[in-house]
Amino acid sequence: QKSDLHHLYPTDSRANSVRGNYNFAEVNGSSVPGNCEASRIGQDRRTTSRSNRFEPPTEHRGNVARALFYFSVRYQIAISESEETYLREWHLQDPVDARERERNNIIYNVQLNRNPFIDYPELPAKIQDF
């Protein structure tokens, strides 16, 4: 799991440290200081939960969604209902692009498997619950 390149991304170390193990959501909160001020940490906009969540930059949200869909299916790890709602939205709002397809091809050449959510963007709609 830890070495699977389909869910590992280079990132700003400060943003990664702040993110920790927080679930993803759109938040009411503050920007992450440092090189990734488009990321935010705070409370989920749609719930009354006081737990912190992490909001990635808009241009990376679809990539995050597809990586987590892959991880959930590949390693049989459930995604919470509230997080899944955001991920499904982000997958549609930030569709697969050429750079993400190329990354999928490169990873295939290294570890001999693909992220099917990149190859088949319609796949999340066919899965009821991650």
Q: Residue locations for each model-derived region?
A:
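Domain-level detector of nuclease and nuclease-like folds
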Residues: 1-130
